[in-house]
Amino acid sequence: MSVLNTDLAKQLGAETLGARLWRIQPGQASTNHRHRHSAEIYLLLEGTGKLRVDGELVELGPLDSVLVEPGSVRQPFNDTDEDQLWLVVGAPVEPANTLEMDEATLAFIYPDGPKALPPELS
């Protein structure tokens, strides 16, 4: 999986929330993952997109958004022929260093493994 990722929060010095721009190219997906404490807003800026939340498929057009609560499994993906541009904002910030996580935490965050593709791209 290859998602072009810009960390806006880091660039702006934000410490209490995360904000990223994701460009998801055709046939690509973000990781299927969840956060223990962070809620995230997924705003599709360009393209048409799909986001699976707890097994349910949500289809979005430009400027559509979805709020994903903590604990929910989420995965945006691109099964179209055009790039998608997403703005993802979440709080509170959670550690993202998977190298320091134990097996149980990794299994919670990535229930299908960190490289699982959605069925639409498999």
Predicted segment positions?
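Short, conserved beta-strand element in jelly-roll/cupin
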Residues: 21-25, 34-52, 89-92
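Short acidic-glycine-tyrosine-enriched beta hairpin
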Residues: 55-71
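Short beta-strand His + acidic residue motifs that chelate non-heme Fe in jelly-roll/DSBH
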Residues: 32, 51, 68, 74-80
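Beta-strand residues in well-ordered beta-sheet regions across diverse protein folds
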Residues: 45, 52-54, 61, 77, ...
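A short glycine-rich, His/Asp/Glu-containing loop-to-beta-strand
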Residues: 1-32, 38
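Double-stranded beta-helix
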Residues: 77-122
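A generic "binding-loop/recognition-motif" signal
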Residues: 37-38, 56, 72-73, 82, ...
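Short, charged/polar surface micro-motifs in flexible loops or helix N-caps
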Residues: 13-15, 25-28, 48-50, 57, ...
